[in-house]
């Protein structure tokens, strides 16, 4: 049906996520002179949030902040990673969130050294373990994303040192945020600080990413992105040092 409304002598812009089976149908009917990626212009419009979007994302972050506080309280109990995830879903529902914006990461001990760890049934924490909690909720279709590190019962000297370096790197990048600064400069602010303290090789990913209706939207906070920050852009700043301390 769509082919009937397309001018065959003009290019057709296609959404980057459009299923191939639909595109093949248009190609077979020779609808349009060419097919081009139409998502870029939409993505660029979505990069800058308006006042209503910012309000919704503030609420999503507020709910997620409350939830992450309750998850940290759960660490007093002997729940495995899967049980914490189940409790988290209940917490979000109680708070009025609309579910998770991505699959949460709960990593105990050695699992916390993997930035893309999959929650493991039967994984229990023990004294001295670091615990990484990476979670986000949805609120009226808008995403939040937060990462926290806590220690169970005790923390080693190196664990405290790595935590403080990561925290300070985060603050260095946040302090640098203003209109006109590039995303590459934000990445460098955190990465250089971590590198100067001897842990650069353990910071294995970009500094952050844009957030909105999708948890990962176009516009990385990385060394490769030389675009400038402008008012209305919403993005994460999440440096990390990933190593197994004392193991």
Language model features: what each stretch is:
Residues 1-247:
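Active-site neighborhoods and metal-handling regions in enzymes and metal-associated proteins
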């Amino acid at each position: 049906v769509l082919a009937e409304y397309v001018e065959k002598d003009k290019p057709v812009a296609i959404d980057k996520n459009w299923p191939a089976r639909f595109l093949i149908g248009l190609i077979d009917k020779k609808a349009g002179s060419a097919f081009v990626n139409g998502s870029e212009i939409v993505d660029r419009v979505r990069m800058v949030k308006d006042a209503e979007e910012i309000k919704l994302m503030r609420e999503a972050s507020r709910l997620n902040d409350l939830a992450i506080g309750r998850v940290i309280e759960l660490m007093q109990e002997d729940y495995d990673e899967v049980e914490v995830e189940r409790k988290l879903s209940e917490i979000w529902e109680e708070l009025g969130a609309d579910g998770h914006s991505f699959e949460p990461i709960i990593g105990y001990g050695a699992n916390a050294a993997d930035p893309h760890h999959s929650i493991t049934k039967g994984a229990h924490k023990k004294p001295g373990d670091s615990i990484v909690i990476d979670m986000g909720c949805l609120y009226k279709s808008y995403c939040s994303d937060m990462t926290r590190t806590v220690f169970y019962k005790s923390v080693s000297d190196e664990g405290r040192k790595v935590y403080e370096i990561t925290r300070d790197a985060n603050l260095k990048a946040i302090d640098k945020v203003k209109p006109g600064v590039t995303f590459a400069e934000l990445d460098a602010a955190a990465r250089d600080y971590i590198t100067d303290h001897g842990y650069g090789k353990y910071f294995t990913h970009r500094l952050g990413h844009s957030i909105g209706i999708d948890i990962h939207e176009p516009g990385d906070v990385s060394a490769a992105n030389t675009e400038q920050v402008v008012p209305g852009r919403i993005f994460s700043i999440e440096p990390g040092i990933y190593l197994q301390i004392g193991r």
